[in-house]
């Protein structure tokens, strides 16, 4: 019996429908296992439930409402000065941090020459120094910091930034734990060369404890860059802005300027103008 066109179309239609049903069944089976493991790592370190904190943020003594943003004061940040020997001291402190940061992501280094020192030292009344006499001797001929550019990142979550997530984020931005128990961004991602800027805990006492980082949390951190400081401050400032934005974006924070106002594009441009004005004044003084 000869099969006509109609019969052929029916057979082909049945085959196509069977193929579609089989493909859908195969995809459903394959998708069951995948959905179980598609977790967002950026939320792995967030708290299981909201926590309230009554920690006092740097600044004059005050009673804080836990539902309000913490008050920051750039005057309580550690004072800074250039110090050519700080890189050697930082190497010892960095070994302490190596236990907590395995397999750190590597990024490109900032393209600066390596002939000028610049690092930050603590103010004696805020951060006790084991060798204050030696520090005074080393710093007596170094220019004092005249201006500080501050960018604070405040957590929108009342539980604050959790230690492991915060540590991972800033390591990815090239900051390394070092002098004064705070983090510094050197011109090299490996932690070598002059310091471009630093990051301190904005909640007293202003430091980080890597030995207890798993239980650490803070409502805010402050990035700061001193002038005079890095030899190319505008480039260093751009790196600092990028690090602060990355932290705010990935850990749900909000950028604030040194007046506790929301950081805007106009604010960032104003900071850059402050750098230009400082360089102009410094050049005028050298010529005079």
Curated annotation (Swiss-Prot):
Keywords: Cell cycle, Cell division, Cell inner membrane, Cell membrane, Membrane, Transmembrane, Transmembrane helix. GO terms for cellular component: cell division site; plasma membrane. It is found in: Cell inner membrane. Residues 48-138 are annotated as: Disordered. Gene3D superfamilies: ZipA, C-terminal FtsZ-binding domain. It comes from the Bacteria. Its main location: membrane. Residues 23-288 are cytoplasmic. GO terms for biological process: division septum assembly; FtsZ-dependent cytokinesis. It is a single-pass type I membrane protein. Residues 1 are periplasmic. Residues 64-77, 85-105, 122-138 have a biased composition (Basic and acidic residues). The chain crosses the membrane at residues 2-22. Belongs to the ZipA family. Essential cell division protein that stabilizes the FtsZ protofilaments by cross-linking them and that serves as a cytoplasmic membrane anchor for the Z ring. Also required for the recruitment to the septal ring of downstream cell division proteins. NCBIfam families: septum_zipA. Interacts with FtsZ via their C-terminal domains. This is Cell division protein ZipA. It comes from Pseudomonas syringae pv. tomato (strain ATCC BAA-871 / DC3000). The lineage of its organism: Bacteria, Pseudomonadati, Pseudomonadota, Gammaproteobacteria, Pseudomonadales. The gene is zipA.
């Amino acid at each position: 019996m000869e099969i006509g066109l109609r019969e052929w179309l029916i057979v082909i239609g049945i085959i196509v429908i069977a193929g579609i049903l089989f493909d859908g069944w195969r995809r459903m089976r394959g998708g069951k296992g995948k959905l179980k493991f598609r977790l967002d790592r950026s939320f792995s370190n967030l708290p299981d439930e909201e926590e309230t904190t009554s920690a006092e943020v740097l600044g004059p003594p005050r009673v804080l409402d836990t539902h309000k943003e913490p008050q920051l004061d750039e005057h309580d940040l550690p004072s800074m000065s250039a110090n050519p020997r700080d890189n050697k001291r930082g190497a010892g402190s960095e070994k302490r941090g190596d236990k907590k940061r395995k397999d750190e992501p590597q990024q490109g280094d900032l393209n600066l020459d390596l002939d000028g020192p610049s690092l930050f030292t603590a103010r004696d009344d805020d951060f006790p120094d084991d060798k204050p006499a030696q520090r005074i001797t080393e710093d007596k001929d170094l220019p004092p910091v005249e201006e500080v550019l501050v960018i604070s990142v405040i957590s929108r979550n009342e539980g604050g930034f959790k230690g492991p997530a915060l540590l991972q984020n800033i390591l990815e931005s090239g900051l390394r734990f070092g002098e004064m128990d705070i983090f510094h961004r050197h011109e090299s991602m490996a932690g070598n060369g002059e310091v471009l800027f630093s990051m301190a805990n904005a909640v007293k006492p202003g430091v980080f404890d890597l030995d207890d980082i798993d239980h650490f949390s803070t409502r805010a951190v402050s990035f700061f860059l001193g002038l005079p400081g890095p030899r190319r401050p505008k480039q260093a400032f751009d790196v600092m802005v990028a690090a602060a934005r990355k932290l705010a974006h990935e850990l749900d924070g909000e950028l604030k300027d040194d007046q506790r106002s929301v950081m805007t594009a106009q604010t960032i441009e104003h900071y850059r103008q402050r750098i230009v004005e400082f360089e102009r004044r410094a050049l005028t003084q050298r010529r005079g």
